[in-house]
Amino acid sequence: METLELQGAKLRYHQVGQGPVLIFIPGANGTGDIFLPLAEQLKDHFTVVAVDRRDYGESELTEPLPDSASNPDSDYRVKRDAQDIAELAKSLSDEPVYILGSIVAMHVLKDYPEVVKKIAFHEPPINTFLPDSTYWKDKNDDIVHQILTEGLEKGMKTFGETLNIAPIDAKMMSQPADTEEGRIEQYKRTMFWSEFEIRQYTHSDITLDDFTKYSDKITLLNGTDSRGSFPQDVNFYINKETSIPIVDIPGGHLGYIQKPEGFADVLLNMWG
């Protein structure tokens, strides 16, 4: 893996291929290895970069997180993630880059539009700008409380039911790692995401105006196998309010690992 030293962290990332830079930003998984099958499909067309977000996988903190980062309304981590991606983009290319992601990608576009050539938001589970935002914020508060008091298994079951996660995704999300060490790491990673990201990222400061001013750069992606899920509803709402196009892409919420060949074909039709 490659390394970029940043304030407070060593950011590590996979890099394969040649051509214009395309950065993949992981969501709850946190690590870029989930994108490697997709990267193999695209490496003849792009320099594909798959990041381990700070404090996930091989990326390591060199300074501790501020105590406030676990506060439900803290934007420290999502803003820091966005800054990391912007600094990575600038280190890799003198030109704006392509980006695929979700909520972090939205903050990259909002705060660092100069690094973005084209960007795709794949099923972002954000609620801030929705008419029923308070309802979803309260639901996420309840889910995190349940995880922290009743256990991860029960809380994640509620999470899947509340967001109407598709069976193809629920099966993959619940699949344990192959080794005991892997299962321990998986548990730690999910607990970290629960405490520091479920509430903070999904209710972070993004508005529809943040999209309309850069609408020519944005594509919304919804999976063909995750119809009816909450993240898809978010994209439908963005589309209704801004007319930013939605493109169907193979697979579910984790389509890039479920159906990488078809997923790559859609990206190439968009950007190739």
From Swiss-Prot:
GO terms for cellular component: membrane. It is an enzyme of class 3 (hydrolase). Residues 20-133 form the AB hydrolase-1 domain. GO terms for molecular function: hydrolase activity. Keywords: Hydrolase. Its EC number is 3.-.-.-. Pfam families: Abhydrolase_1 (PF00561). It comes from the Bacteria. InterPro entries: AB_hydrolase_1, AB_hydrolase_fold, AB_hydrolase_sf. Belongs to the AB hydrolase superfamily. This is Uncharacterized hydrolase SAS2467.
